[in-house]
């Protein structure tokens, strides 16, 4: 899609200018929808948790509270960013940007449809997402150190140890997907699940599906893995000294990563943009008019609801329990399942291994 735009611009502009304009439009096309979705995901979270606690949630700004995210954004932008006197001022400001940039950059390879709606359809898409998403921990560590606060530093140490621990399990879960799909291209992984719900990878990789999603909860510091910002223990964790828009940027990064994990889970395990009724007589023709991106967004919405549901349901783990779950449960399970998938690959278990 963007290649055609670049070719058209090159017909009456300098080549370098056409490339520059195309790259800027690609960045805007990726960043703007993500930021808009993040804004209203915060509203959805407050509404969902409110209903689970038998209350209304935000309902004052706009009809049904729909304009609450705009009010929150205005409030964050008009607040002062207070920089602690003894902090490292430059790193203190840079840290939120370092946390947000990887969460946004990872979206460059996420496909949204079978028609090539993707900013960069590279062959090593899975490796790119895993590598870029892991960089976000640097922003968290730097924020804790630069704040010159013991609470912030403790939260940063917790977050870094937690992310490193669960990235191993997440990486092994991705290895099993690559063994089944035989490609690291995200579009190719989705196309390998064509043929109906029984061809999706969640069936042969069911333990990996749960491991990946649980690791995603831990990676994003979401409940019940939110010890890095445990209010009852270390006030607010690594961003305890932040205020205003600098504080909001950390939340943008967290929610952008939530959406990214949901998209990756839907793409790798739940058939991406393919209909769950594909191959089912009667139902396939009834739902054939629904575009592929609608199915993808529906799956992502369900996974995001699980993020919100878990926050409202489960109590926070202790730090030692989180480490034990990552190192003594999830990693051994993933290693065992790598061997199981290898056996299924050897015997060509149909329909996933052909």
From Swiss-Prot:
Species per Swiss-Prot/TrEMBL record: Hydrogenovibrio crunogenus (strain DSM 25203 / XCL-2) (Thiomicrospira crunogena)
Keywords assigned by UniProt, alphabetized: Cell inner membrane, Cell membrane, Membrane, NAD, Quinone, Translocase, Transmembrane, Transmembrane helix, Ubiquinone
GO molecular function, one term: oxidoreductase activity, acting on NAD(P)H, quinone or similar compound as acceptor
Reaction catalysed by this enzyme: a quinone + NADH + 5 H(+)(in) = a quinol + NAD(+) + 4 H(+)(out)
Quaternary structure annotation from Swiss-Prot or TrEMBL: NDH-1 is composed of 14 different subunits. Subunits NuoA, H, J, K, L, M, N constitute the membrane sector of the complex.
Family from the record: Belongs to the complex I subunit 1 family.
Enzyme class at the top of the EC tree: translocase
Primary localization class, coarse: membrane
Bilayer-spanning residue ranges: 16-36, 90-110, 126-146, 170-190, 197-217, 249-269, 290-310, 329-349
Membrane topology: Multi-pass membrane protein
Name this polypeptide is given: NADH-quinone oxidoreductase subunit H
EC number: 7.1.1.-
Cell compartments where the protein resides: Cell inner membrane
Gene Ontology CC, one term: plasma membrane
Function: NDH-1 shuttles electrons from NADH, via FMN and iron-sulfur (Fe-S) centers, to quinones in the respiratory chain. The immediate electron acceptor for the enzyme in this species is believed to be ubiquinone. Couples the redox reaction to proton translocation (for every two electrons transferred, four hydrogen ions are translocated across the cytoplasmic membrane), and thus conserves the redox energy in a proton gradient. This subunit may bind ubiquinone.
GO biological process, one term: aerobic respiration
């Amino acid at each position: 899609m963007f290649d055609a735009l670049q070719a058209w611009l090159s017909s009456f502009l300098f080549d370098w200018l056409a490339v520059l304009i195309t790259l800027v439009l690609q960045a805007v096309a990726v960043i703007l929808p993500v930021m808009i979705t993040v804004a209203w995901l915060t509203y959805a979270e407050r509404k969902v948790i409110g209903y689970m606690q038998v209350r209304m949630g935000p309902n004052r700004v706009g009809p049904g509270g729909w304009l609450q995210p705009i009010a929150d954004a205005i409030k964050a932008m008009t607040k002062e960013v207070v920089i602690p006197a003894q902090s490292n001022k430059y790193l203190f400001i840079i840290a939120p940007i370092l946390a947000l940039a990887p969460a946004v950059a990872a979206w460059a390879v996420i496909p949204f449809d079978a028609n090539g709606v993707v900013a960069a359809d590279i062959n090593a898409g899975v490796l790119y997402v895993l590598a870029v998403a892991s960089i976000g921990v640097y922003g968290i560590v730097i924020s804790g150190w630069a704040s010159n606060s013991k609470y912030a530093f403790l939260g940063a140490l917790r977050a870094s140890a937690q992310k490193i621990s669960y990235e191993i399990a997440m990486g092994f879960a991705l290895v099993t997907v690559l063994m089944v799909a035989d490609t690291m291209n995200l579009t190719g992984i989705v196309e390998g699940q064509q043929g109906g719900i029984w061809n999706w990878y969640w069936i042969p990789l069911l333990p990996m599906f749960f491991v990946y999603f649980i690791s995603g909860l831990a990676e994003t510091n979401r409940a019940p893995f939110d010890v890095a910002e445990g209010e009852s223990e270390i006030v607010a964790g690594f961003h305890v000294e932040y205020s205003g828009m600098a504080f909001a940027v950390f939340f943008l990064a967290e929610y952008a990563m939530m959406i990214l994990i949901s998209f990756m889970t839907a793409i790798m395990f739940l058939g991406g943009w393919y209909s769950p009724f594909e191959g089912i007589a009667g139902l396939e023709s009834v739902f054939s008019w629904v575009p592929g991106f609608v199915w993808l967004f529906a799956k992502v919405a369900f996974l995001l609801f699980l993020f919100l549901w878990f926050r409202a349901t489960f109590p926070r783990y202790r730090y030692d329990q989180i480490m034990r779950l990552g190192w003594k449960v999830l990693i051994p399970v993933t290693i065992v399942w790598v061997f199981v998938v290898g056996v299924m690959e050897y015997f060509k278990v149909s329909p996933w291994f052909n």
